């Protein structure tokens, strides 16, 4: 959930609910997920999304005026990443304010597409690929989560270290497939 301070609910298939939000709720979600078989997250199947390649995603821009906490006294804003052909599994974004959570829904008008036909062709409930927390200057981010498991953060000098996965299991074990978590809800 996005709140001040920022915390992530990062579990496969997490389905937080709107309303009261606290650590007990996160624990209950984790217990419920652990008690049932794994179900892969929803993948968006869309011919329009299939067209959003590397070059095209560089042209799709989040509108800074639509950022979470834009126009408030918060020193940070949160911008969102658009889905594309490399990231087709949306993450759910929840905002926690005054101890209550609410889901933040994707809207086309949050992005500048540069291609009006593409914007119209994309599903209305597309979802987000992830988010980034912007520095007070609004020009650079200091934390980003995108896709199933990618994240990065900058240090005190605003320099990124290595990009990373949240956790990886059996990365060098012969005969075993690598496993890693999926970020599905924040």
Which stretches of residues belong to each language-model region?
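N-terminal export signals
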Residues: 1-13
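Intrinsic-disorder/low-complexity coil detector
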Residues: 4, 15, 36-40
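Short N-terminal segments immediately surrounding and downstream of signal-peptide cleavage
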Residues: 16-34
